[in-house]
Structure formats: structure tokens, C-alpha cells
Amino acid sequence: MSQKKSPRFELRSGNVDALLLALQTADMAALRDDLLARFEATPDFFSNDVIALDLRALEDDSEVALGTVIETLATLRARAIGVVARPGQREWAERFGLPLLDSQARRGSGADRATDRAAEARAAAAAEQAAADQAAREESIRAAAQATTDAAVAAAIRQTQTMLIDKPLRSGQQVYAQGDVVILDVVSYGAEVIAEGNIHIYAPLRGRALAGVKGNTGARIFSTCMEPELISIAGIYRTAEQTLPADVLGKTAQVRLADEKLILEALRLK
């Protein structure tokens, strides 16, 4: 075999930095669950780090299923590159296709402790960031819920405010009520009454009446003399071109919405 040095490669001795995962249990299913519980929420913790599996804390005859922990590490974006084992463990450890590594450090040495502290610091920082992100999400949800509640309360207050008008509405006049409106005099031709709630007219309605204008399909229009130019509830309207039923025209009646159709009914007051 030629001993001539090749210009295309060079073999050197060197050290490769790797995390050492010291296994403290032979229960690989439990170990998998612990690893996932600790690191799954922070998928960038390992960031393609290489890891050596330290088996020296296990019994020589444990013969653990290292495939489980190797697959779990791969899920967490880490790669097992070898095992550190005692002589009595090497025969079964080699079955998983990982090379046997010599560790210059002893368990409990300063180097191991420094590595452990670095790993703990990274895990703590990742957990702190995850907790901060969760707190921010919860605060956003609380703020949105509070805004929705405030809007609902404001809407309820508006709806409880009833406008009262005791003068006739002349042609060209318009009133707008954020809740219900009660009118005690005539609404003339050309006048317009608009309300987010109900419209009560204890006089002839000859102009236009639009109730539930913000989409309140439960709003109604009442009049003691129903002769409108136009009636509308939640945007569904009817004009004077459509003749009112005889029992409604000029009578005490109400208008309501059912299945997106205007229903006109005479009121028989007792």
C-alpha cells in the first residue's frame, strides 16, 4: 500500500464538541416522554446538535432499546453520534450502529458540570420565552374579550335609551334614535323616522319609518293609524306602491319581520 501523502485530503487528530446525554434509567419509554415534555415546546433548543449517549450510569445487563432515544432525539432536531459505555455494556450497545466513544471527562467533572449548566441555561431561557409568549397570547385574548364585553354593554345602554317626541314631524324632518323611539303626534308625508330599535307612533304614520337599521331583526313598527310611505325593518322594506291589507290600512297595526319578510298585522287592543 502506498504511503504517499495525498494533496486531496489530510487526516488529523482532533476533538469534536458534543453534548453528553447521561441516561439515568433503562425505561426508554419514560425517558422519551421526559425528553418530549421538556424540549418539544422549544424545537430550536438543540438546533441540529450532535449528542453522545452516556450509558455508564446503567447496569451492565440493562440492554436498553437505544433506538427509542435515538428516534426521539431526531424528532427534537438532535443527532446521536455515538455511545460512551463501560466494557460490560459495549457488546449490546454496538447493536444500534453507533460507534463507541472514549470520554476523557469523568462524570461529575468540571467539564460535565459546565456542559450541564449551559444546557440548563438554554432550557430555562427557552422555557421563559415560551411562558412569556403564552402570557402575551392570554393577555391578547383577555383584551379582546373585554373589548367585546364593553361593546355589548354600550349597545345595551343605547338600546335602553328611548327617545320621546311629542310634536308632529313635518315633511322634510328626520329623527334618528339609537334605541327605541316613541312619537305622540303625526308623522307627516315626507317625514322620516329612523331607529336602531322599535318605533312606536301613537298617531298617524304617513311618512317613512325604518326600524332596526343596525340589523336588529327583532325590531317592530307600531302605529295607531298605519298609512306609511315606506316601512323597513333591518333593511327589508315595503313602499306605498304595495297597497296595505284592508284590516291594516288606516288601522292600529304593527309591522314585524319573519323569515326575511315583512308581516303587517292589525292590533286589536282591549
Curated annotation (Swiss-Prot):
Any GO BP annotation: regulation of cell septum assembly
Keywords, comma-separated and alphabetical: Cell cycle, Cell division, Septation
Gene3D superfamilies cross-referenced by the UniProt entry: 2.160.20.70, 3.30.70.260
The organism's place on the tree of life at top rank: Bacteria
SUPFAM superfamilies (UniProt xref): Cell-division inhibitor MinC, C-terminal domain (SSF63848)
Subunit structure: Interacts with MinD and FtsZ.
Main function: Cell division inhibitor that blocks the formation of polar Z ring septums. Rapidly oscillates between the poles of the cell to destabilize FtsZ filaments that have formed before they mature into polar Z rings. Prevents FtsZ polymerization.
Family the entry assigns: Belongs to the MinC family.
Xref: NCBIfam families: minC (TIGR01222)
Record-linked PANTHER family: SEPTUM SITE-DETERMINING PROTEIN MINC
Name the record gives this protein: Probable septum site-determining protein MinC
Source organism (scientific name): Cupriavidus necator (strain ATCC 17699 / DSM 428 / KCTC 22496 / NCIMB 10442 / H16 / Stanier 337)
